[in-house]
């Protein structure tokens, strides 16, 4: 029997388990009670293609993952990141979940096709604005943003010219 769990339900369950056991509660983790040192960083990590969705919004260009996942037979069930977890539209809620779970950091990657839709040339400011708003919200909630500059998400047009190493 296969049971499908929605991301928010899974996260809520994990947070509940951690907080009910005191693992993430300030009385344990923040004071370094011997389980974890006081300076231990509790965080979460995501990959832009796996969570953002909104692949055709705000002038985002096609990425190598768009090309790969839309090629028949490459991904089980033909799944794509077209919608994914819809983080692009639900990032406020996602940051609130991190904050309510007493995390202290969030590591995220950039979708370069959202910033440089064609791999070179003009910067798409709506892409930068998205990440700017995300960082502002993280800081406002007391979460330390950790930016991963590259996690295998490249504009397809740049890949067709040889990737990062092209002239």
Task: Identify the meaning behind each predicted range.
Residues 2-18:
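N-terminal secretory signal peptides and thylakoid transit peptides that target proteins
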Residues 62-97:
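Aromatic- and Gly/Pro-rich amphipathic surface segment
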Residues 46-65:
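Short, solvent-exposed beta-strand-terminating loops
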Residues 27-30, 90-94, 131-133:
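Short alpha-helical segments and helix-capping/turn motifs at coil-helix boundaries
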Residues 21-45:
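C-terminal segment of N-terminal export signals and the immediately downstream linker at the start
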Residues 97-167:
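Substrate-binding cleft and catalytic face of glycoside hydrolase catalytic domains
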Residues 2-3, 83, 123, 165:
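Pocket-edge positions in alpha/beta enzyme catalytic cores
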């Amino acid at each position: 029997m296969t049971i499908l769990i929605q991301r928010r339900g899974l996260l809520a369950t994990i947070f509940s388990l951690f907080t009910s056991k005191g693992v993430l509660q300030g009385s344990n983790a923040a004071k370094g009670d011997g389980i974890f040192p006081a300076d231990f960083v509790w965080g979460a990590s995501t990959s832009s293609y796996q969570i953002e969705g909104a692949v055709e919004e705000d002038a985002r260009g096609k990425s190598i993952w768009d090309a790969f996942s839309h090629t028949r037979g490459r991904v089980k069930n033909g799944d794509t990141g077209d919608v994914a977890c819809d983080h692009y539209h639900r990032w406020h809620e996602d940051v609130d979940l991190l904050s309510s779970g007493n995390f202290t950091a969030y590591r995220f990657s950039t979708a370069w096709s959202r910033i440089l839709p064609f791999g070179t040339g003009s910067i798409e400011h709506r892409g930068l604005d998205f990440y700017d708003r995300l960082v502002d919200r993280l800081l406002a909630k007391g979460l330390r943003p950790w930016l991963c500059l590259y996690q295998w998400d490249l504009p397809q047009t740049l890949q067709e010219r040889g990737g990062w190493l092209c002239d």
